[in-house]
From Swiss-Prot:
May down-regulate transcription mediated by NF-kappa-B and the serum response element. The lineage of its organism: Eukaryota, Metazoa, Chordata, Craniata, Vertebrata. Residues 1-40 are annotated as: Disordered. This is Zinc finger CCHC domain-containing protein 9. Its main location: nucleus.
Length: 271
């Protein structure tokens, strides 16, 4: 058996060196320009010049022409012509007398409402009485005499002395020997440790015009802060179990008020 030596095809398919873009452009235009007519040859030359131009240069943006009329598509004129207002199912033009009257009435009501609001603010401010100088029109936080006096301690927490929060938001625990409010100064006696409402020299306490708590009669707190009402609400009373009582028995705490029987009046018919 005879064997023939053959050259493998893998050695024939070797990669050639890469062609540069300039050689490719020259070769493509030279090969195609010979077979093309003159007109197409000129177009090919123009394309080659455009491609060779540097890409960094951009065309300058042309300035837009200024419009003489701002209403380009006529939309503003359309709105002016069709400006109408629907009132009670009837179409009324916005420049009619009825619409003008309604606008005037609405503005008048608005001005009156604003005037009443300012009057309420002025009345509330005049009713406020300063605890330090006893003058109306401002509170102790805005009192000029209290701000000048550094011993008053305005703008601080009366319980812990912090300037970052008020006494209503304070959660600090204080020694009872120092008093309820160690950093507070009484307006009546001028001593530290208590407020004017709990001062022994102030018989009226929290009620400057007289009176007291409606539940216990104290002058040191309001009715909403009365300890008796808070204790009575928290107390829970449990009834006793009697012999023969049902397991589903529920005690009714609120006793219904007895209703008065209505007396029927005889109806008289006159002919």
């Amino acid at each position: 058996m005879t064997r023939w030596a053959r050259v493998s095809t893998t050695y024939n398919k070797r990669p050639l060196p890469a062609t540069s873009w300039e050689d490719m452009k020259k070769g493509s235009f030279e090969g195609t320009s010979q077979n093309l007519p003159k007109r197409k040859q000129l177009e090919a030359n123009r394309l080659s010049l455009k491609n060779d131009a540097p890409q960094a240069k951009h065309k300058k943006n042309k300035k837009k022409k200024e419009y003489l009329n701002e209403d380009v598509n006529g939309f503003m004129e359309y709105l002016r012509q069709n400006s109408q207002m629907v009132h009670n199912g009837q179409i009324i033009a916005t420049d009619s007398e009825e619409v003008r009257e309604e606008i005037a009435v609405a503005l008048k009501k608005d001005s009156r409402r604003e005037g009443r609001r300012l009057k309420r603010q002025a009345a509330k401010k005049n009713a406020m009485v300063c605890f330090h100088c006893r003058k109306p029109g401002h509170g102790i936080a805005d009192c000029p005499a209290a701000l000048e006096n550094q011993d008053m301690g305005t703008g601080i927490c009366y319980r812990c002395g912090s300037t970052e929060h008020e006494i209503t938001k304070c959660k600090a625990k204080v020694d009872p020997a120092l008093g309820e409010f160690p950093f507070a100064k009484c307006f009546v006696c001028g001593e530290m440790g208590h407020l004017s409402r709990s001062c022994p020299d102030n018989p009226k306490g929290l009620y400057a015009d007289g009176g007291g708590c409606k539940l216990c009669g104290s002058v040191e707190h309001l009715k909403k802060d009365c300890p008796e009402s808070q204790n009575s609400e928290r107390m829970v009373t449990v009834g006793r179990w009697a012999k023969g009582m049902s397991a589903d028995y529920e005690e009714i705490l609120d006793v219904p008020k007895p209703q008065k029987p209505k007396t029927k009046i005889p109806k008289v018919v006159n002919f």
